[in-house]
Structure formats: structure tokens, C-alpha cells
């Protein structure tokens, strides 16, 4: 293997090693130290998982690949969230944390991930345009088949408001959401992709290996990273709760924001790497697909995990969780409305980031409902502007796929739909 690849894998293994020692020995010296050790292991394993999932696309194609890679790539986030949901079946105190991690990761992805990738991509295009003395683009254009992802996300965002209205996530709702996820994978698997896959960073080094070696490395990384994540998910989740009390920070806040940062970091970094290499559409396409994952498979799995842990068939939501769901769903509707025409403008990216930052200053319940209303108002304005794209977007998940490249683009910018 290339020395650069060996060094990166070894570094991740070294970072994860203390957590394995803690887990095997049962050592728990301090809640904050536990959080650092187990959190670092989650980040390291997430990087290995992301590299393997990216490189695996060289050898696996079709709907099966999409299904497998989608499930594997979200393992870090799901492992923590489903642990909380499972524990809530026997301990009601954990019910709040299951929804906290989901809403935090969801808003982080759209409020931080989307704008960051778009602004980086447009900055790169601006520099390229300046060198070539041509007009710089003001928006990132997505391929036409991205409408499938946006269509599914739009339907899921609208359906998400039913959850706070019911005050719970019923198990039948979870089953429906999981079926929607299966339909999304099937529909995504039908999309034509005739171009050459592009790889960056460690994934590119893995892809360059001989076929037999490459497949062995990919399988090895999958197994090793999954084993680490499954081993440390429980102590990491518990350390988030314990560390909050130890340092005087709301445990709910740590679960909502620190856990998603650990699990989403590799995906963000890989998306930014794509944007830095002029593949902005591929980068944002991956993050849009991740939103579909979260609103379907993740939310749908919560009541099932709760029931499996000894709870009832419904995962109850308290007032704070209902507030968080409304804020998250309204943000998703706003994000979908802004990209409905498959053009992501720089001012839209700045607006999403600004509103995301504003929520940390607005902490009271009434203020957060006002912020939700503001997000919905922005969505209404964007829907009016993009009204011609509403019906095509809502119909996209049900239409027969058409092989087509977006104008002025290339197949290499076709967004991935694996995460």
C-alpha cells in the first residue's frame, strides 16, 4: 500500500486505541476524559468508514451498492441515536436524547454543511473564472437528476410536521418512513450514471491499488471501523450525558451538537474536498442525500429501537422535543424551497448559515417558534419565486428516470446518493 495511505490508517488506529483499551478494561477515570477518548474514536472510525465507502463505489454498482453504502456510511450517527432510543425503552430519562441527536445532526447538516460546501465551491469557481477572465458564477447548478433527492426531501419535510402535531413518533410512522427510505434507494438505483467516478484523498489512494488488494483493504476498513463504532457507541453516548453534569453544561446540548459533530465531521471534510477540486455539485448532492437518510431511516428507526428496548409502540416527545422538531422541519422546508430550481445561490448559503447561527442566541420557547415561523415565511417566498419547479420536484420521485446531463456540466459532477 502507498505509505501515505498506511500513515493515515495508522493514525486513525492510534487515535481509536485508547477507547478500545477503556472499553475492554472497563476503565472510566473521568466523564470529560471519557468523552474525549470515546469521541476521538468515533471520529477516527468515521474517517475510515467514509474512505472505505467512497472507494467501494469503484467495485460495486447499482441499487445494492447504494443500499449497502447508505446503511454503512450512517453507522456512527445511527449507533449513538439508536442507543439512546433503545435505552429509553427501559429508562424514560433517555427519551429526550434520542430526538436531541437527530434534530442536532439534521440542522447541522443543512445549516452548516450545505452553506459551507456551496460557498467553497463558488469561491473556487470565482478564482477559476478570474484566471480565465470570464464572469464568475453566482450559484451552484445541480444536475437534473438531483430533483429525485430534492423531491424525496420535500415530501419528507412536509410529512415531518405530523410528528410534533401527534406529540410522538408512532411505530407505524417509523415503518412508513423506513419504507420511504427503501423506495428512495430503489429510485436512486434506477438513476443512470454513465460517467467515471471521481475520488479524492485516501479513497483515491485505495482505488489506485490492484483490484484484489483494493477489495481487501475496503472490506478490512469496513469491518474495523464498524467494530470500533459498535464497541464505543454506548460509552460515548453515556459520557455525553455524564460530562454535561460534570462541567455544568446541559447534557441535552452536548448530545444535540457534540455527538453529531463527531459523526458528521468526516462527511463534511470529504464534501469540502470535492468542492475544493471543482466538484461542487457532487459535494452538495451527497449532503442532500444525507438529509433524506436522516428524515426517513433515522427517524423511522427511533420508535422501533424504543420498542425493542422494552418501551411501548410510540416514542413520546416532551414540549422541548416538539419545539426542536418544529424548528428542524421548518428549516428543512426552507432549505428545499431555496434549491427547488436546482440552483444554490451564494446569498441562499449565507442566509442558511446566518439563521442556523441565530438559533443559538434564541433559546426561549416562544422565540424558537418565532424563528420557525420566519423560516417558513422565507420558504413561502422562495416557493413563489420557484413556483414552476414545485410540481416537477414533487413528481420526481414517481417519474421514470431519464439519462441526462445538466447543461454545461459533466458526469463527474453527478451527485452521489450513497449517504
Question: Residue ranges of each PLM-predicted region?
Answer:
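Hydrophobic alpha-helical segments, chiefly the membrane-spanning helices
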Residues: 1-419
Amino acid at each position: 500500500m502507498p505509505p501515505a495511505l498506511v500513515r493515515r490508517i495508522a493514525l486513525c488506529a492510534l487515535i481509536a486505541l485508547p477507547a478500545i483499551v477503556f472499553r475492554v478494561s472497563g476503565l472510566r477515570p473521568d466523564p470529560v476524559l471519557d468523552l474525549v477518548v470515546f469521541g476521538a474514536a468515533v471520529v477516527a472510525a468515521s474517517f475510515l468508514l467514509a474512505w472505505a465507502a467512497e472507494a467501494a463505489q469503484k467495485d460495486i454498482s447499482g441499487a445494492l451498492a447504494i443500499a449497502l453504502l447508505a446503511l454503512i456510511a450512517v453507522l456512527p450517527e445511527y449507533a449513538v441515536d439508536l442507543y439512546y432510543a433503545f435505552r429509553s425503552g427501559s429508562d424514560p430519562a433517555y427519551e429526550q436524547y434520542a430526538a436531541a441527536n437527530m434534530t442536532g445532526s439534521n440542522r447541522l447538516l443543512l445549516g452548516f454543511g450545505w452553506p459551507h460546501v456551496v460557498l467553497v465551491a463558488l469561491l473556487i469557481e470565482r478564482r477559476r473564472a478570474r484566471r480565465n477572465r470570464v464572469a464568475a458564477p453566482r450559484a451552484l447548478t445541480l444536475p437534473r437528476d438531483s430533483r429525485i433527492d430534492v423531491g424525496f426531501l420535500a415530501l419528507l419535510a412536509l410529512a415531518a410536521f405530523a410528528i410534533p402535531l401527534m406529540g410522538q413518533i408512532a411505530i407505524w410512522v417509523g415503518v412508513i418512513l423506513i419504507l420511504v427510505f427503501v423506495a428512495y434507494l430503489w429510485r436512486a438505483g434506477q438513476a443512470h450514471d454513465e460517467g467515471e467516478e471521481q475520488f479524492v484523498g485516501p479513497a483515491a489512494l485505495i482505488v489506485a491499488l490492484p483490484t484484489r488488494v483494493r477489495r481487501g483493504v475496503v472490506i478490512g476498513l469496513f469491518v474495523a471501523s464498524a467494530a470500533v463504532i459498535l464497541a464505543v457507541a454506548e460509552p460515548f453516548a453515556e459520557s455525553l450525558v455524564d460530562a454535561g453534569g460534570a462541567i455544568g453544561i446541559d447534557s441535552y446540548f452536548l448530545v444535540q451538537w457534540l455527538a453529531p459533530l463527531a459523526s458528521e465531521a468526516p462527511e463534511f471534510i470529504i464534501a469540502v474536498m470535492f468542492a475544493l477540486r471543482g466538484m461542487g455539485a457532487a459535494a452538495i448532492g451527497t449532503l442532500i442525500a444525507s438529509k433524506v437518510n436522516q428524515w426517513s431511516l433515522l427517524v423511522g428507526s427511533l420508535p422501533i429501537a424504543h420498542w425493542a428496548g422494552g418501551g411501548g409502540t410510540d416514542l413520546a416527545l416532551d414540549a422541548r422535543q416538539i419545539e426542536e422538531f418544529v424548528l428542524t422541519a421548518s428549516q428543512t422546508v426552507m432549505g428545499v424551497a431555496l434549491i427547488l430550481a436546482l440552483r444554490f445561490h451564494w446569498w441562499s448559503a449565507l442566509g442558511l448559515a446566518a439563521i442556523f447561527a441565530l438559533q443559538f442566541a434564541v433559546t426561549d420557547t416562544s422565540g424558537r417558534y418565532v424563528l420557525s415561523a420566519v423560516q417558513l415565511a422565507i420558504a413561502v417566498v422562495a416557493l413563489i419565486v420557484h413556483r414552476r419547479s414545485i410540481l416537477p420536484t414533487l413528481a420526481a420521485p414517481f417519474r421514470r428516470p431519464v439519462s441526462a446531463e445538466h447543461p454545461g456540466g459533466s458526469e463527474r459532477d453527478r451527485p452521489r446518493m450513497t449517504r
